Amino acid sequence: MMERFEKIEMKIPAKAEYVAIIRLTMAGVANRMGFAYDDIEDMKIAISEACTNIVQHAYKEDVGEITIVFGLYEDRLEIMVADNGVSFDFNNLKRKVGPYDINKPVEHLPENGLGLYLINTLMDDIQIMHDEGMTVLMTKYIQREQVENDGNPISTYNSY
């Protein structure tokens, strides 16, 4: 049986001035689903980085589109960010930029690739697919807070 979910799909021009619209939409969706404030802030950074990577690298001189799909599941939010621009080898880039040595000063960190490192750090799961363009699938699970009533855990989650 297929897992039940709701889907929200958006398309924006691959321009920096539209990234805030996606970030605000995602924050509203995540808030409605019951995500904690810190998790919403993490997802805002991750989706901004994914969209900014497309704006800076995917289309070069041409102006293309960014497709964003939110998959709202009971226990998680899946965010797909896709373009039809120039793609790159994520695994090769990942080897070049991470992991980082915490003893090195910030000045010695590489300038490129930090966005993908941030996304990988802030989200629970990330998948990169590249055929015609690049697709980034990010997943964040809802952390249910629990309180106890007479020794029995009670979820503070209210379903939407």
Swiss-Prot record:
It catalyses: L-seryl-[protein] + ATP = O-phospho-L-seryl-[protein] + ADP + H(+); L-threonyl-[protein] + ATP = O-phospho-L-threonyl-[protein] + ADP + H(+). Its EC number is 2.7.11.1. GO terms for molecular function: ATP binding; protein serine kinase activity; protein serine/threonine kinase activity; sigma factor antagonist activity. The keyword Transferase applies. It is an enzyme of class 2 (transferase). The keyword Nucleotide-binding applies. InterPro entries: Anti-sigma-factor_SerPK, HATPase_C_sf, RsbW. Signal peptide: none annotated. Keywords: ATP-binding, Kinase, Nucleotide-binding, Serine/threonine-protein kinase, Transferase. Negative regulator of sigma-B activity. Phosphorylates and inactivates its specific antagonist protein, RsbV. Upon phosphorylation of RsbV, RsbW is released and binds to sigma-B, thereby blocking its ability to form an RNA polymerase holoenzyme (E-sigma-B). Belongs to the anti-sigma-factor family. This is Serine-protein kinase RsbW. It comes from Bacillus cereus (strain ATCC 10987 / NRS 248).
